[in-house]
């Protein structure tokens, strides 16, 4: 079994491509169930800045073909041109770095770990995250906790929502006296509301399709909740609008926002879209009085602040390397131990048989002490013969080496003949590979 990662992110793909693969949760589950046909395991990670599929599979080439087919169907051929791929230990390193927010647009942001955990839980619920992938994710979460504890990267970091509010403050030279609107009461909306309040916004409105969620958030931050049906009226009165909903189509278009212009009498409107797919149609930004930004624009804004966190990121990178090495070694031990156990059982059975044959041939000419000495000699020979292969398997470091040695031992000593025969008789659950042109990276 080998880990594969195929995906795209803000580093490789524009927002127009990423939002095509931003699936609602129900569709993510459908994809997982198609990909995770036993014995393949699958994880689908989707955030505003990345879409990645992780696969643990005995046939890496077959699993890769299936994933590429899904990504092509969902995102079109153009999406394939922006993909990156990692395999084996490199895929593990990438998973750990993503969970630790070392590959995020905003280095060190805390939200990504929660998003990966949600993907993990969704995968478990779909029966797609099992065994090795479950252990890899658990190790990545443990690594992220260690990074948060042992480095200052989280304390030094900002978030997408904080960056959006900083940009709004820069545009208006502060938010004192400004009316702000938060559209969406999820995690990103909650962060935006808190930062807007801290930045000194005079009036804070929160709206959400489910009014009770808007009311709960407004109560926490000292704002006012309004029904979603009042959305455009709220925008008409606002100076700043921050959007982060799960809508699959834009909430704001050039037509419905443009219709508000006459009543505003030229008063500028700052709109920032933290959603993927976007809540704000890009054409809205062509209105003279609207300053519209999306997540890619926020990336440019936060790039200047990344240097302050670079040193902590280096420390975190060392911890990631340590934790990946630990996981790889533990996995090699897990996979090597059954072979060692069968090898020892085989050797001990042979030793017992030969000792009994020898004792039988010698008959009654041996006393008890001599018989025990011969039995001890048989055990000692087994222990000495198996010491070196046992130590070698347990000391193995690089991923794949443990599998190679264990497989060689199993084949040389005929330890897996029964299992191989059973597996050969079992029908394949995977279809023939689909040829997909992968394009550039």
Swiss-Prot record:
Pfam families: GlutR_dimer, GlutR_N, Shikimate_DH. Its EC number is 1.2.1.70. InterPro entries: 4pyrrol_synth_GluRdtase, 4pyrrol_synth_GluRdtase_dimer, 4pyrrol_synth_GluRdtase_N, GluRdtase_CS, GluRdtase_dimer_dom_sf, GluRdtase_N_sf, NAD(P)-bd_dom_sf, Shikm_DH/Glu-tRNA_Rdtase. Substrate binds at residues 47-50, 104, 109-111, 115. Keywords: NADP, Oxidoreductase, Porphyrin biosynthesis. The active site is at residue 48. Possesses an unusual extended V-shaped dimeric structure with each monomer consisting of three distinct domains arranged along a curved 'spinal' alpha-helix. The N-terminal catalytic domain specifically recognizes the glutamate moiety of the substrate. The second domain is the NADPH-binding domain, and the third C-terminal domain is responsible for dimerization. It catalyses: (S)-4-amino-5-oxopentanoate + tRNA(Glu) + NADP(+) = L-glutamyl-tRNA(Glu) + NADPH + H(+). It comes from the Bacteria. The record marks 94 as: Important for activity. Belongs to the glutamyl-tRNA reductase family. NADP(+) binds at residues 184-189. Catalyzes the NADPH-dependent reduction of glutamyl-tRNA(Glu) to glutamate 1-semialdehyde (GSA). One of its GO terms (molecular function) is NADP binding. The keyword RNA-binding does not apply. The keyword Oxidoreductase applies. PROSITE patterns: GLUTR (PS00747). During catalysis, the active site Cys acts as a nucleophile attacking the alpha-carbonyl group of tRNA-bound glutamate with the formation of a thioester intermediate between enzyme and glutamate, and the concomitant release of tRNA(Glu). The thioester intermediate is finally reduced by direct hydride transfer from NADPH, to form the product GSA. Coiled coil: none annotated. Homodimer. This is Glutamyl-tRNA reductase. GO terms for biological process: protoporphyrinogen IX biosynthetic process from glutamate. Pathway: Porphyrin-containing compound metabolism; protoporphyrin-IX biosynthesis; 5-aminolevulinate from L-glutamyl-tRNA(Glu): step 1/2.
